[in-house]
């Protein structure tokens, strides 16, 4: 059912046609391995007018004016040829190519594929391994079916089933908590929280640390408190971030952990407000513990139209003030991440509604349009059409740096070069600050056969024009090699805690939590929980062992295929990593899809369908919120203290001529931008400098350029 209420900014046109045309022209360029000249022109698949653009017009748009005649004969714009050239396009005759003075591009061949033994045995090996993997998949399916049927028919019956259905029908987080506590009480799981002993964390250390922190805080021993906090503000201190602490109840963890979290937050806030600690000591302290504790990131996987479930994940986090400031997305997840990082909180609350489906029109072309296009170009969708449609989600031609300045959130989108052996790039405000988000979004969605590789575009803010990024190289779907870029996030932003929303259908089918997952304990009988026996394995020990055995065996043979390079390079892409990546994080959400959903995997959702996807994402996020809330409560307390200590240090050290705040210093005082050296490399603030300036305003702006090893942090006061 379609609503008549208009969507927020529904009628706004964020499209810059000049940028779209420049992007479309860039797609027509090709290079040559030998002389650098342009290769034969491509067939008209991006529009008849664009296909007819001559090389001189393109060169004037995409490259600077040459200085001499030798430069005029060789354009500086370089892109790949083998991935972009249509797989079904007719080849021009050699005579015509020679007439234009162009050489045919030489095909590249992997040197390790040249041996006689490889040529002779490759296909027999691949066929045998594939048949064996299929047999293992059948056995794996039998084990999973046994576990599911045993739980459905023997465990989830009677009142327990009624309470679970009630829990699944919860529409708000508050309602979900109420229903989860009711189910915990019925299953006697609430008693588990009051028993401190548990083998997955050091409860004695947690209790002693809590008592010590409380004693130091109450006695006003601020220096000692600060030193003691440095020892416990680290990732997974004493095991308190072990997932098993949140996997034995539908809502809740050990009471000891609750008390510890509250005391740590209170102690950090006490240090922040303490007048017994110098601002410089505070700054050093918060700089150290921030680096030690790390940051949290939200990672949204690809998954075609299943990725729209991420809207519900973002909405649940936003409604509970838990949306991390670092968000990464790949393919369809990149679309959701782009929307979240280019809009403010208030704007997002108006956009994350079923009416957003009106702007999701990527798959609107009927079959009689996209089938001929696929036959001509090798891709179902048109790149320039997607560029126009994605502008609403990226707020026009916004760059990564501009999005960060607008919302304070750091957007990351993973893309893969068209060359199968080139390294992956994680585009963000550090690696590609001037790169236009929608071009990166298209590249991350360029699955072979769905969308051809595209050129990333970057903005020249002074001229308000765009030019090709990275010498015009072409890029495609990042999920082929790095769906969840955890290592890159740690490098750029010191991320060591990740919330992963995984909707890839080929991955979620193999998810199995034998010991339960966060907010979803193993379904044990009430007889066992009544006797305070809370630990059990799904389906029993034998079923769990067989499930793990078959899954590891499948992974082993997939690894063998990758190592021996047995798979053919379809569309010049390496497909061997799509099952062999790391797809999980500290918290992993696996929204379940029905078989009928696969029919609509490349279809635009209706308002009713998108509303159901949003509700599904919320339901699957609710069980994880408590775990994330505990983590972010400490992280946010550290950031509050760090922000305040920076402001205090800058004010006291660089304003010695007067006391008080800038508004009392006269109408012509203005505190200008402060540039800090790297917070973690400098041992003191001796390198920190203040650039004073005088104008008629009294507004003070403080900017820190070094939030982490290579990140930016802006604070406005």
UniProtKB/Swiss-Prot annotation:
Q: Record's PROSITE patterns?
A: PNPLA
Record EC number: 3.1.1.-
Record key words, sorted: Hydrolase, Lipid degradation, Lipid metabolism, Membrane, Transmembrane, Transmembrane helix
GO CC, one annotated term: membrane
Q: Where is the composition biased (Acidic residues)?
A: 704-717
The record's subcellular location field reads: Membrane
Catalytic center residues: 331, 477
> Which Pfam families does this entry report, sorted A to Z?
DUF3336, Patatin
For biological process, the GO terms are: lipid catabolic process; triglyceride metabolic process
- The transmembrane segments are 123-143
**Top enzyme category:** hydrolase
What InterPro entries has UniProt attached to this entry? Acyl_Trfase/lysoPLipase, NTE, PNPLA_dom, Triacylglycerol_lipase_N
Any one GO molecular-function label of the UniProt entry? triacylglycerol lipase activity
Membrane topology type, per the record? Single-pass membrane protein
Which Gene3D superfamilies does this UniProt record tie to the protein?
Cytosolic phospholipase A2 catalytic domain
Q: Where is this region: Disordered?
A: 680-717
Find motif (GXSXG) and give its ranges.
329-333
The PNPLA domain is annotated at: 298-490
Name the source's superkingdom.
Answer: Eukaryota
Q: Which family does it belong to?
A: Belongs to the PLPL family.
What is its biological role?
Probable lipid hydrolase.
Instruction: Note the PANTHER family from the entry.
Output: NEUROPATHY TARGET ESTERASE/SWISS CHEESE D.MELANOGASTER, TRIACYLGLYCEROL LIPASE PTL2
Protein name, per record: Patatin-like phospholipase domain-containing protein PGUG_03164
Whose protein is this, by species? Meyerozyma guilliermondii (strain ATCC 6260 / CBS 566 / DSM 6381 / JCM 1539 / NBRC 10279 / NRRL Y-324) (Yeast)
